[in-house]
């Protein structure tokens, strides 16, 4: 378990060091991301009542489709990475079930049958 935590920390530090710093003076300021529903809804509202058959100069419809697919792809990658981190940090979802094992151990009688409590305590099981 300690080894997996050490690897997770090392991976996190590596990812943070590779990530471009937001404090660089030449970098443009980042615009905060809006929820996916709002971002997709705004360009459709700006288009007005245009139909699919209407052509706009500059191919605005293709750009909208590309933005939407890029947004969906980014969301899918984010979900996959979160699932990977959850698996890494929590080795098994029911780890408590498997960690303890049996506290008292299975008391088996002469014929391999589990003894009841009275039989195991008094020795009358065999």
From Swiss-Prot:
Residues covered by region (Disordered): 19-72
Skewed-composition ranges (Gly residues): 46-63
Primary localization: secreted
Regions annotated as coiled coil: none
Pfam short name (any one): ANP
Keywords, ordered alphabetically: Cleavage on pair of basic residues, Disulfide bond, Hormone, Osteogenesis, Secreted, Signal, Vasoactive
GO molecular function (one): hormone activity
Disulfide bonds listed in the record: 110-126
Biased composition (Pro residues): 26-35
GO biological process assignments: angiogenesis; blood vessel diameter maintenance; blood vessel remodeling; c-di-GMP signaling; cellular response to glycoprotein; cGMP biosynthetic process; chromosome organization; cumulus cell differentiation
SMART domains per the UniProt record, alphabetical: NAT_PEP
Localization (cell): Secreted
Key word Zinc-finger present: no
Propeptide part(s) removed at maturation, as residue ranges: 24-73
Region forming the signal peptide: 1-23
Single GO cellular component term: protein-containing complex
Family listed: Belongs to the natriuretic peptide family.
Protein name: C-type natriuretic peptide
Species this protein is from: Sus scrofa
Highest classification ranks of the organism: Eukaryota, Metazoa, Chordata, Craniata, Vertebrata
Gene: NPPC
């Amino acid at each position: 378990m300690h080894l997996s935590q050490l690897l997770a920390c090392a991976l996190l530090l590596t990812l943070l060091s590779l990530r471009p710093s937001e404090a660089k003076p030449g970098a443009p300021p980042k615009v905060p991301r809006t929820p996916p529903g709002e971002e997709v809804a705004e360009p459709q509202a700006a288009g007005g009542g245009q139909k699919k058959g209407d052509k706009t100069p500059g191919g605005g419809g293709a750009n909208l489709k590309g933005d939407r697919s890029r947004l969906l792809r980014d969301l899918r990658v984010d979900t996959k990475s979160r699932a990977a981190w959850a698996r890494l940090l929590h080795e098994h979802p029911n780890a408590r079930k498997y960690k303890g094992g049996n506290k008292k151990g299975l008391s088996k009688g002469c014929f391999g049958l589990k003894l009841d409590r009275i039989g195991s305590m008094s020795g009358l099981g065999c």
